[in-house]
Swiss-Prot record:
One of its GO terms (molecular function) is mismatched DNA binding. Disulfide bonds: none annotated. ATP binds at residues 626-633. The gene is mutS. It comes from the Bacteria. NCBIfam families: mutS1, PRK05399.1. Belongs to the DNA mismatch repair MutS family. This protein is involved in the repair of mismatches in DNA. It is possible that it carries out the mismatch recognition step. This protein has a weak ATPase activity. InterPro entries: DNA_mismatch_repair_MutS, DNA_mismatch_repair_MutS-lik_N, DNA_mismatch_repair_MutS/MSH, DNA_mismatch_repair_MutS_C, DNA_mismatch_repair_MutS_clamp, DNA_mismatch_repair_MutS_core, DNA_mismatch_repair_MutS_N, DNA_mismatch_repair_MutS_sf. Gene3D superfamilies: 1.10.1420.10, 6.10.140.430, DNA repair protein MutS, domain I (3.40.1170.10), MutS, connector domain (3.30.420.110), P-loop containing nucleotide triphosphate hydrolases (3.40.50.300). This is DNA mismatch repair protein MutS. It comes from Burkholderia orbicola (strain MC0-3).
Length: 885
C-alpha cells in the first residue's frame, strides 16, 4: 500500500486511521480486519482477495475523498478462506476486536493476534492430516574472500515443535529442499541465493535477523540452555544464524512464545542414505511421476491407524538411516508384534490405536494456547486409554528393545489426566463461547450460575400456574424469546382480566404480551446469570490451558511413542498381509535378493513374476537387456525399493534378502525437458549421469536406464559404453545398467565384475509375450516392432518398418566398419581408461546368410527346400571349420 503523508492520513476517518496503522505494520500481508460478524479487507487487499477468493468487491463510502474498496468473509467461515489463501502461498494477519464496544470512545480497540503463513500452520482446519508443514530459514556462510562455503538450514514443524539444523554444501541445496519439502522459506533481504523452482513459498526478512551471535543466543534461550554443545550445534554457525531468524519469525506470527519448541536435532548427511531429487521422484516414494499420491510406496505402506503414524512413515521413507542398527531394531519389533500372543494380538492393538487422537498436534495447539475444548477432551480420552494399550504390548516388550522403549514412553502423565478429567465436560461444545465446556463440580461459582439459568423452566411453570389462579385466565402463558425476553401472553378476549401490575410489552394481532415486576426481576437475574456463566467459563478454560503448559514435554513424549508404535504395527500388518520377510544385514559388500518383487506393482496386478538380484565384490554391474515393456525398469526399481525398505526398517517383498552397507541410491531413469531451466532432455540426462559418476562410491546403488538414448546412435552408444566402464573401473558401485545397445553385452569379457542378464520374451506369430523373468546372459533381440504393434501402431507402418529393418540389417552386414568397432582400442591419448580393447564383428558376412538373401521361399518346391536346407548346413560347417566365429 502506498505510504500516506500525515496530511492525507489525517483526512481519513478514525476507524480507517486505525486500519491504516495496522496495515503499515503488515505491508506484504493480507489483513483480515474484524468488524462485527465479518472480517473485512480494504483497498488493494480487498481487490486481491476478491480476485483470489472470488469475493464480491464493494465500496464502503469514502475516506479522505477516496472510495473505499472492500471485500469480506464471515467470521464463522474464515478457516476455509484461510486454507485457500495459504495454498496459494499468501499470508494473512488476523486482526481482532479486543476492546469492549460498549465502553469504547471512538473505534473499538483492535490488534493483530496472529499471522497465518504457509509455514506456520497449527489449526486442524488448515493442516493436512498426513503431511507435516515446515518453516525453513537458510543462511549462507562465506569465507574471508566472500565465497560461499556452506548453507545453514534451520527448519521447524510448528504444529509439533520439532526443530532441526543442518549445514550443507551450496550445491546440495536442491537435494536438501526436496527432502525437507518446506512450505515456506525465509531468506535475508539482499541475498543472491537462488531457490529452486517449486521449493516452497519464499519470504524475505531483514538481514540482521540472521546475525549469528544473536541467533545462537536466541536458540539457547529457546531451549533454556547455556550452550549448544550438548546438541552438537556449537560449530554450526550458519545454521544458528538461520535458526535465529526462524524463531523470531515464528514467534512473531503467533504473537507469543513457542513453549513447545524445547528440543533440537542436528542432521548430518552421513546419517541417512543419500537420495537425490531424481531418485525420490523416480522411485515414486510419496508421489507418482504423474504427481498423484497413489500408487506409491507410501500409499501401499500407509495402513496406520493414527495420523501421527502416517506422518512418521513419510519422514522415515525420506530419511532411511545408513546404520543397519536402527532398521534391525524396528524389524525386531515387527517380528515381536507378528508373534504376539492372543491377548496382545496385532489386530487388537491396531483396534485400540484407532481410538487415539492426534496428540502431537493437540500438544502444539495447547502450547500456543489455541487448543479448543474438543482437543482437550480428545487428549483426556487418549491418556485414559494408555494403560490398556500398554497392557497389550507388555507381554512382548521383552522380545524387542524398540517396543520396551515405546512402552516406557507411554506412561500417562497422571496429573495432566486428572486435571483434564475434572475440568473438561465429557462431551464439550466445539467452542468455548457456546458454553458447556467446563465439567460440573469443577467450579462452585459456575455451577451456581448454571443452576440459575437451567432452573428457569421450573420457575416459569410455577409462575404460570400462580398467574392463572390469580387472574382466572385459563389460557395464560409465560414464555421467552431472544428479542423480547420473558413475557406473559394473554389472548384478546381475556385482556379485561389483566391485573394492574401487568405492563404491556408487545401487542400482537390476537394477543397482548405483558411483563410483571416479579418476572422482570427474574429476567434480569436469569439473563445476567447466562452472561456471567459464559464469562466465568471462558476464564476457567483459559486457566486450564495455562495449568496444562507444564505437561507439554510429557505430552510430546507420549505423542512420539504413539506414532512409532502405530507405524511399527502398520509395518507388521503389511508384512503379514503381503507375505514379506525380514531382511538381514552384513558388513560385507553385497546385495542378495531371492525372489524379489516390486511392492507397488505387485499390488496392482493379479500375478507378479519374482526375480533374483545378486551383487558382490566379484559382481558389481548387471547389464540388463530385453524388450521394451519386458520389465527392465520394474526390476531395477524393485531392487532399489527393497533396499530402501530394508534400511527404513520394514519387512521386504522377497523370499529372502541380505544387504551390505549402502550409502546412497542414485537413479537415471527417464527424463523430460527442463523448460524453466533451459535444459533439453539429453542435458537433463547427462546432468544426472554426471552426478552419479562424480559421487557414487563402492557402497552406492546406481540405477541406469537406457543412458545415451537422447542423442545420435553412435554418440549415445559411445557415452553408454564409457559410462558403464567408468562405473566399473572407478566407482565400483552396485550398478543396474539397462540398455538397448546390445554391443555393451560384450563388457563382461573385459570386466569380470560385469554380468549380463536379460528379461525374457517369446514371439507368437508377429506378436510377443513378455515373461518378465530375469535370466542370465544377454537378450537376443529387442522386439521393438512387436512392442510397437502392441501399442496400436497401424499395420501399414509396422509392415513398412519390417521392410526397412531388413534393409538396415543388410546394410549393416555389408559395412566394412560396423557399429561394434566402437569397442576397438582407441588411441591412448584419447582414452584414459585402461584395457579399452573389445572384440569387433567379422568384416565379411556368413556365406549361409548370403545364400539365404538370394532365396525366395514362395518359389521353392518341397524337395528343393529340403535340398537347400542340407546345403545351408554344409556351408555353416565349412565356415566353422575354417576358424570363423
Amino acid at each position: 500500500m502506498t505510504t500516506l503523508s500525515p496530511e492525507a492520513f489525517a483526512g481519513h476517518t478514525p476507524m480507517m486511521q486505525q486500519y491504516l496503522r495496522i496495515k503499515a505494520d503488515h505491508p506484504d500481508t493480507l489483513v483480515f480486519y474484524r468488524m462485527g460478524d465479518f472480517y473485512e479487507l480494504f483497498f488493494e487487499d480487498a481487490e486481491k482477495a476478491a480476485r483470489l477468493l472470488d469475493l464480491t468487491l464493494t465500496q464502503r463510502g469514502a475516506s479522505a475523498g477516496t472510495p473505499i474498496k472492500m471485500a469480506g468473509v464471515p467470521h464463522h467461515a474464515v478457516e476455509q478462506y484461510l486454507a485457500k489463501l495459504v495454498k496459494m502461498g499468501e499470508s494473512v494477519a488476523i486482526c481482532e476486536q479486543i476492546g469492549d464496544p460498549a465502553t469504547s470512545k471512538g473505534p473499538v480497540e483492535r490488534k493483530v493476534v496472529r499471522v497465518v503463513t504457509p509455514g506456520t500452520l497449527t489449526d486442524a482446519a488448515l493442516l493436512s492430516d498426513k503431511n507435516d508443514v515446515y518453516l525453513l530459514a537458510m543462511c549462507t556462510g562465506h569465507n574471508k574472500r566472500g565465497v560461499a562455503v556452506n548453507i545453514g538450514l534451520a527448519w521447524l514443524n510448528l504444529a509439533s515443535g520439532a526443530l532441526r539444523l543442518a549445514e550443507i554444501e551450496p550445491d546440495q541445496l536442491a537435494a536438501a529442499l526436496e527432502r525437507i519439502r518446506p512450505a515456506e522459506i525465509l531468506t535475508p533481504d539482499g541475498a543472491t541465493d537462488a531457490i529452486p523452482a517449486g521449493a516452497g513459498a519464499s519470504k524475505r526478512v531483514p538481514a540482521w535477523h540472521f546475525d549469528i551471535a544473536s541467533g545462537t543466543q536466541r536458540l539457547c534461550d529457546q531451549l533454556d540452555v547455556a550452550s549448544l554443545d550438548g546438541f552438537g550445534a556449537h560449530s554450526l554457525t550458519s545454521a544458528c544464524g538461520a535458526a535465529g531468524a526462524l524463531l523470531l519469525y515464528a514467534a512473531a506470527t503467533q504473537g507469543q512464545q513457542l513453549r513447545h519448541v524445547r528440543s533440537l536435532k542436528v542432521e548430518n548427511e552421513t546419517e541417512y542414505i543419500g537420495l537425490d531429487p531424481a531418485t525420490r521422484r523416480n522411485l515414486e516414494l510419496t508421489e507418482t511421476l504423474r504427481g498423484t499420491e497413489s500408487p506409491t510406496l507410501y500409499s501401499l505402506l500407509d495402513t496406520c491407524c493414527t495420523t501421527m503414524g502416517s506422518r512418521l512413515l513419510r519422514h522415515w521413507l525420506h530419511h532411511p538411516p545408513r546404520a543397519s542398527v536402527a532398521a534391525q531394531s524396528r524389524q525386531q519389533a515387527i517380528g515381536a508384534l507378528l508373534d504376539a500372543p492372543a491377548n496382545a494380538s496385532l489386530d487388537a492393538l491396531r483396534s485400540a490405536l484407532r481410538q487415539i487422537a492426534d496428540v502431537e498436534r493437540i500438544t502444539g495447539r495447547l502450547a500456543l494456547l489455541s487448543a479448543r475444548p474438543r482437543d482437550l477432551s480428545s487428549l483426556r480420552d487418549t491418556f485414559a486409554a494408555l494403560p490398556a494399550l500398554r497392557e497389550r504390548i507388555s507381554a512382548i516388550v521383552a522380545n524387542a528393545d524398540a517396543l520396551a522403549r515405546v512402552d516406557a514412553a507411554l506412561a500417562p502423565p497422571a496429573e495432566c489426566l486428572d486435571l483434564l478429567t475434572s475440568a473438561i465436560a465429557p462431551e464439550p461444545a466445539a467452542m468455548v463461547r457456546d458454553g458447556g465446556v467446563i465439567a460440573r463440580g469443577y467450579d462452585a461459582e459456575l455451577d451456581e450460575l448454571r443452576d440459575i439459568s437451567e432452573n428457569c423452566g421450573q420457575f416459569l411453570i410455577d409462575l404460570e400456574a400462580r398467574e392463572r389462579a390469580r387472574t382466572g385466565i385459563a389460557n395464560l402463558r409465560v414464555e421467552y424469546n431472544k428479542v423480547h425476553g420473558f413475557y406473559i401472553e394473554v389472548t384478546r378476549g381475556q385482556t379485561d382480566k389483566v391485573p394492574d401490575d401487568y405492563r404491556r410489552r408487545q401487542t400482537l394481532k390476537n394477543a397482548e404480551r405483558y411483563i410483571t415486576p416479579e418476572l422482570k426481576t427474574f429476567e434480569d437475574k436469569a439473563l445476567s446469570a447466562q452472561e456471567r456463566a459464559l464469562a466465568r467459563e471462558r476464564a476457567l478454560y483459559d486457566s486450564v490451558l495455562q495449568a496444562l503448559l507444564p505437561f507439554i514435554p510429557e505430552c510430546q513424549r507420549v505423542a512420539s511413542a504413539l506414532a512409532e508404535l502405530d507405524l511399527l504395527a502398520a509395518f507388521a500388518e503389511r508384512a503379514r498381509a503381503l507375505d514379506w520377510v525380514a531382511p538381514t544385514f552384513t558388513d560385507e559388500i553385497g546385495i542378495e535378493i531371492e525372489q524379489g518383487r516390486h511392492p507397488v506393482v505387485e499390488a496392482q496386478v493379479e500375478q507378479f513374476i519374482a526375480n533374483d538380484c545378486r551383487f558382490g565384490t566379484e559382481r558389481k554391474l548387471l547389464l540388463i537387456t530385453g524388450p521394451n515393456m519386458g520389465g527392465k525398469s520394474t526390476f531395477m526399481r524393485q531392487t532399489a525399493l527393497i533396499a530402501l525398505m530394508a534400511y527404513v526398517g520394514s519387512y521386504v517383498p522377497a523370499k529372502s534378502a541380505c544387504f551390505g552397507p549402502i550409502d546412497r541410491i542414485f537413479t537415471r531413469i527417464g527424463a523430460a525437458d527442463d523448460l524453466a531451466g533451459g535444459r533439453s532432455t539429453f542435458m537433463v540426462e547427462m546432468t544426472e549421469a554426471a552426478a552419479i559418476l562424480n559421487d557414487a562410491t563402492p557402497q552406492s546403488l546406481v540405477l541406469m536406464d537406457e543412458i545415451g538414448r537422447g542423442t545420435s546412435t553412435f554418440d549415445g552408444l559411445a557415452l553408454a559404453w564409457a559410462i558403464a566402464r567408468h562405473l566399473l573401473a572407478h566407482n565400483a558401485c552396485y550398478t543396474l545398467f539397462a540398455t538397448h545397445y546390445f554391443e555393451l553385452t560384450q563388457l563382461p569379457a573385459e570386466f569380470p565384475q560385469a554380468a549380463n542378464v536379460h528379461l525374457s520374451a517369446v514371439e507368437h506369430g508377429h506378436g510377443i509375450v513378455f515373461l518378465h523373468a530375469v535370466n542370465e546372459g544377454p537378450a537376443n533381440q529387442s522386439y521393438g516392432l512387436q512392442v510397437a504393434q502392441l501399442a496400436g501402431v497401424p499395420a501399414p507402418v509396422i509392415r513398412a518398418a519390417r521392410k526397412h529393418l531388413a534393409y538396415l540389417e543388410q546394410q549393416s552386414a555389408s559395412q566394412h566398419t560396423p557399429q561394434l568397432d566402437l569397442f576397438s582400442a582407441p588411441p591412448a591419448a584419447v582414452d584414459d581408461l585402461e584395457c579399452a580393447d573389445a572384440p569387433a564383428l567379422p568384416d565379411t558376412p556368413h556365406p549361409a546368410l548370403e545364400k539365404l538373401r538370394d532365396i525366395d521361399p514362395d518359389d521353392l518346391k518341397p524337395r528343393e527346400a529340403l535340398d537347400l536346407l542340407y546345403e545351408l548346413r554344409t556351408l555353416v560347417r565349412s565356415h566353422d571349420a575354417d576358424g570363423h566365429a
